[in-house]
Amino acid sequence: MEQIVTFGGITIDNVSPDHIQQLYSVKLNGTSNNEEIPTEFPNIIQSVCSCDKHVVELTMDVFKLVDTTENSSCAICRYQENEPCIEHKSSESNTKCPIAQSVSCSHSFHACCISRWLHTKKTCPLCNIEWQLIGANNDSVVIYFDDKNQEFKLSDNLVEDIGRQFGIDMDNYIVCKNKSPVTEYKNSTYALCTRDRHNSQNGQTNLKIICEFDSKTENLFIKYSTTIEELRKLVSQTFDLFKDQVKLIYNNIEISKDFDNLTVFNIGIKNDSNLAVECYKSFTYDMEITNNFMVLYVPDTFNTTNSSNNIQSVVSGSIAWIPQPFIDNVTNKDLRCLLSSLYILVKKVNLNTELIQSVTDRFEKYMELYGMHYRQIKLAKDSLRCLLEMNHFNNKDRMILSCTFYELIDRIQRDNNINKNPLLSSNLICNLILSDKQVNEQTKINWKFLAKDVRITKVFNIYSPLVLTNSVPPLLTLNKNLDVVVFTGKGKDVSLPIILYDTLTNSETDVNAAELGKIVSDKGDLMMVDDRIYEEAIMVCIDTSNSMSKASDFDEDIKLKRSSIIETKNRFYEILKTESHSSPQESDIRQLTNTIIWFITHPNFEDWYRKLYSQELIRSIACFEQKVYPNFAMMLVKYPWFFNKLLTSKKVVVNNTWYSFIRNESNSNYNETKYSKEPLQEFLCPISHEIMEHPVVAKDGFTYEKSNILKWFENKSTSPMTNEKISKKICDNKVLKSIIRDWKENNTVIEQSDKLSVTIKLPDPWNETVIHYNETDNIWDLIYQIYHITGLSHDQYKLTSNYWAIDKSSLIKQISSKIKIHPFEKKMVDVKICDKTYFFGTENTMTVSSFYTVGNLLYKLKSRKYHRYAVWYGLKDSGDGFQRGTILSPHDKLIDYSEMTLEIHSSNRYKTPKGNHLSRLDVVKKLFDAYINRSIAYSFNTAIGLMSFSDKSVLECAISPFYESFREKVNELDTSGATALYECLKDSIENLIEWKNADLENRSKAKLRIICLTDGKDTGLDKFKNTVKHKSQYHNVTIDCILIGSDYDNYLGKIGEKTNGYVFNPSTIKYALDIMELETMISSTNRKTIFYHNTIDEKTIPPIINPTKKLHAKAISPMEIISKTNENTKLSQKLIRVQREIVDVMKNQHPDIDVYINEQDISFWKIVFKGPDSTPYKNGTWLAYIQFTEEYPNIAPNIRFVTPIKHCNINNYGRVCHSILDRNYTPNVKISLILQCIYGLLLNPDVNDPLDTNLAMIYYDANGLYEAQIIDYVNKFALKSREEWNQELAKNQFKNW
């Protein structure tokens, strides 16, 4: 008897079930099987919904008839109750309608009106409460459950009462109204349903389960209605397992596959439940021996695919693919690669019998070449055939193929000294058996050549996610976990443009190609995913120098800025328009008095008094002070006569009261304090013979008033009493000070007067005094008296009472206790002043009081128009002729800046706010954002880098195809420094060259380009200019410049001209954004060589390369082309397909579309579109062309309009934006359908996905501007008739515009 063989060429002597189970540590069907975990659940909860039973039809039974009420009206028809209702009036009936009253809310209505209302509404039209049935209690609810109903009292324990009455666990049920869960109850009817029957939007009926697998814990959020099968699939995706491999255990009971159709609610899974997940690592196998070859495989119990023609059901996640027990070290990542590769293989043979035979034969030869057992070869070949034919492919075939592929790849790798998981190279073997190369039975495979063949043939290449947006599925690619998956199509959502199929979990996901490409590149080798053949590399250079903070100089900005300045200036000078008066109005007397006192007691009064032009001076003061003292400023311009009088005579009378700058202590309104007793001699200062306030003891042993002795010591060093030389040290006499204070309080005499009085503590050397005041006097009046007593200006001290600061607008009589003056420390400081308002500038040092402010300084140094000046400190050069520093507020104290040099500069207080215009850098950021958006939309094979420059150039983002995230970096840029323009251009050229040389295989033909966004004025080193010029020309680097602003370097334009670059200097933001939408700016690959000697103006559209010769070639009708085609002519696959499309277009001819085929080249068509009626295009006809490239039909044909057309989905170069040419294109799409879709754009433009955003933005405007622009283009370019086009194209008389 011949020996039994199995995988790996292993021979088996004994194939009894017990021996096989022991040999492979498996279980076989038909043998005893002791289950350790029970699989039957003790209680299955049945689903219940009672919603249809709780709905009770409302009828007139919920109302009772009552008598009419005078002056009451029906809430529905609004007629009086004692009048006929609207129905009776319309029928001209004179009978009165009965009045029906609700038993729920007691509101009354005409019976006819309420009967009609009940057909659609169940609530009262007045109070909106729900009507109840007669007999129902107001504090109860009726619950319907299954076939039962029960009335319950409304209470806090209602839910518990319901559960107790019906004998159910309320954790499994919810109370519903109209099939929606409720939490607040009122007098009504409700249904009791199980939680799986209704899913609320607020998540009330959803639940969280905690899944644990191999020390991993994940929270899954599902619905109660989720089936066990859906849960099993979700768990498999979460933990990366085969769905059939997932074992779910709940409460120590396995949820077997018998329960897959039940919901999680049915088996009692509750919120926050723990679910144990295990993996079937050992299965119950069937054993089958065919031609003495033994195979163990999982029975076809759960995934029967016999005779199925669905590829996803044939090649998808199933435990049958796991090659256990023969091979143990296979991971899910390995199996994904195998299944994805087989998916592509099945798709490529496409039920082609001849090709299937070729593939299986080659598979057989390679297995023989590497010495695999002939019985295994026979079985594996048959299994592969079943797979490719998708016919009778079962789990036994899955086991055979997974083991055989593993073994064949492993033998090839061992022969090449490769150490890698075999199944991760499944795509290489699939490519090998699909290729048409002859199998050399004498020479084994070179692994390097095998990998190279994959890249050459491209069928089983693992493609970059970035490539997929322009590729035809299916293709192998990587997901975010670097697993091999299959790109199966393009999504409907523009933001998620590709669909990936995970063969292991049998699931599809829509993803963003750019984001996925970035993730994959961050996790692995960039070259592994970036396998595109690049057409162009672009370095975007952004100017961030100081000059970029200036206004853009755009027309709209200039107008806005000018109008904003005028508006702000007018608002600033609005106060000067106030009408002046010679005598004060009654309501202004108090405020005018306050202003006069403020003016007199101002520390700069003497400076104002010395200056000429008092009228203009007063207006200047008003403008300068209006922000802080708006009331004083208003008085200055409203009553200028009073202040002119002060500036000429230093005194003025208001309301019969004189106010003077000249101090007159004898006439001041205050009295010295008097005492009932003579003070003791010890209380008097020996120097002044006055009662002491701050007694101090000197070294001579005598006590003096502190201020007096200090003044004595300024000029002398002897004792005032003994005339002997003494030390100047003194110390406080606190005991005497306390005794004097008590004596004053007990002996002060308050004289009777008609006026009110207040005690005020004056600073040294003045004594405490009593000041008299009138009933209406406020603190400003007190300040005036203090000025005349002490000469202190109003900003040299503060007033307090009981340690609280006093508001200057308060009435004096509101102060209940003694007022104390706290003078600010007065000392003189030197301040360096550099006045830059003069042509040559002046520098000097001023000695000013410590309480002097910036405003006081300007009042002292300038004669008028103080608001036109600003004081700065810390000014330093920051490049581009800019200086940076800190501008001081008029109220900043000069003492804080005594060690610095302050500079006075001219300044506009009414300048336009920054938010009212776009800075040049703001414009650049918007342009960059628009450029990135367009680059993503066009999906050219382009890599982009980002540099910024000010004092130096900085590489912000290296050249990469993952440029979508660059916007975040650009938004962070800010202005500073000079403009090292040419240094940045030099560094950009070097970066581009380095990028190109790093991968010549994919980048050698890539064009190199720089897009420079700048104001164009270089302030860096001139030595780089020639370097940039020579390097850019030598390495063919194109330099495009978009100049923002009115000043730029002409040398930059010359370099752009020499490199076939563009130089734009847009005058409006609209034109600037239009530039970024030019196709030749997005990619220069189709840019026509043309030299501009200056900046490109707004009306010029840079030309694109068109197939000129083919456009001018003779074209004939499809019928003539077909008749001329020679049946014996051999055509390529592309032209055969084109020929079919010609026939299809003839069969499906559109009435407004004419098709012409080039006589000498059927791959070039000319199309004439007639504008649809009832659209702005109705009077026009347009010529377009279709060019079928070599990649057709895998890639959509190139279609462009030749006749200029104004359309938001067609760009300036005639390129059409439609999903059928992009994400919705497949090789099966007919040209006739594409033409119909383009015609459909003329009928209904897609304004949500435009190429011309400006036109799309005005589409919905009712001003007719959208239609006017289109009609203007029609009249300029598209008035040629279809007959004229026919003659031109047939006679080869086509003319360009």
Swiss-Prot record:
This is Probable bifunctional E2/E3 enzyme R795. GO terms for biological process: protein ubiquitination. Residues 899-1082 form the VWFA domain. The keyword Hydrolase does not apply. One of its GO terms (molecular function) is zinc ion binding. The active site is at residue 1217. CDD domains: RING-Ubox_WDSUB1-like, UBCc_ApmR795-like. The RING-type zinc finger domain mediates binding to an E2 ubiquitin-conjugating enzyme. Signal peptide: none annotated. Pathway: Protein modification; protein ubiquitination.
